Amino acid sequence: DIYSATADDIKERMEKGILDIALLMEPVDIGKYEFVRMPQREHWGALVCADSPLADKETLSPDDLAGQPIIIAKRESVQNELANWFGDTYDKMEIAATYNLILNAANMVRNGVGAALCFQMDNRYGDLRFIPLRPRLETGAVLAWKKNQTFSETSSQFIQFIKNSF
């Protein structure tokens, strides 16, 4: 099964033994886990309506987003990362909503709630436009599993494959 949720929810399921292996987006505390860092980095930007005043920009700076209603991820560690990117401008941010899955955020953008800060996706949202952040903000990912856990043969082989691949 593939299960989508925030890193915090997924780690909780791993601790309970419901999930064996997880792809976790950083920033994330992985002290309890063995992991392999994925080579691809994700780039942050804003998902905006095509008719937004921001839609004509090639990139967005903290000053461009100041005073605009913003939709951000609900994870505190991600919010802290974004606060660091915004710097002194963070105090001027208007946080309109938070999200746990990008599809929810895209629907909020579509309905005029604000611009969603998110990773660049291969998905096309028709009437929405992704605009990269400048200065560039990147996030990594790790494939993680509990230390010293006994896995099924299939899970063990998959972990070994991942270790050998990256």
Residue ranges and their predicted role:
Residues D1-D29, T98-L101:
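Central regulatory/effector-binding core of bacterial HTH transcription factors
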Residues D1-I2, G87-A97:
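A local structural motif
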Residues K11-E12, D63, A106-N107, S156:
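Alpha-helical segments flanking ligand/cofactor-binding loops in enzyme cores
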Residues M14-L23, W44, D91, V109-A116:
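Alpha-to-beta junction loops
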Residues M25, P62, Q68-D91, F151-I159:
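Secondary-structure junction motif
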Residues I30-R37, R41-H43, L103-T150:
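Beta-alpha-beta core module
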Residues K32-W44, V48-I70, E153-S156:
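Flexible hinge/capping segments at coil-to-helix
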Residues E58, D63, A144-F166:
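Extended ligand-binding regions for polar small-molecule ligands
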